[in-house]
UniProtKB/Swiss-Prot annotation:
GO terms for molecular function: mRNA binding; structural constituent of ribosome. GO terms for cellular component: cytosolic large ribosomal subunit. The gene is rplM. The keyword Lyase does not apply. This protein is one of the early assembly proteins of the 50S ribosomal subunit, although it is not seen to bind rRNA by itself. It is important during the early stages of 50S assembly. It comes from the Bacteria. GO terms for biological process: negative regulation of translation; translation. The keyword Lyase does not apply. This is Large ribosomal subunit protein uL13. CDD domains: Ribosomal_L13 (cd00392).
Length: 143
């Protein structure tokens, strides 16, 4: 009888990938990043093991939101005090802090447990063109 292959954490080879978000919808870039972080693009994907790669997202400020999401979609946070709910439209958030918009989108697409928190640490988002990870020799991910 054959058994399903289960990857072990020390057997996994990790690569670095760069995703250019310029002119692409935020959600599509975020879903590709989540797929790479989980390792679902690899044949040795194992759901309960970190088999994913490192992901660098550049040009976060040049990403687009389709439809009327810039005005209608809101970013919520709460101070945990009564009346402490803050609501910021994504149009303002993308101008002031596009990195936070990408991090929130990708984090929502990862598992909501210890593994997801570990995977999220392998995501690096930068608003501009440059990034400090040239020494890792990242590959460009096209989709």
């Amino acid at each position: 009888m054959r058994t399903t292959y289960m990857a072990k954490p020390n057997e996994v080879e990790r690569k670095w990938y760069v995703i250019d978000a310029a002119g692409k919808p935020l959600g599509r870039v975020a879903s590709e990043a989540a797929k790479l972080l989980r390792g679902k693009h690899k044949p040795e994907f194992t759901p309960h093991v970190d088999t994913g790669d490192f992901v660098i997202i550049i040009n976060a400020e040049k990403a687009v939101l389709t439809g009327k999401k810039l005005e209608k979609k809101m970013f919520y946070r709460h101070s945990r005090y009564p009346g402490g709910l803050k609501a910021i439209p994504y149009g303002i958030l993308m101008k002031t802090n596009p990195v936070l918009a990408f991090e929130k989108a990708v984090k929502g697409m990862l598992p909501h447990n210890r593994l997801g928190r570990k995977l999220f640490k392998k995501l690096k988002v930068y608003a501009g063109e440059s990034h400090p990870h040239q020494a890792q020799k990242p590959e460009i991910w096209q989709f």
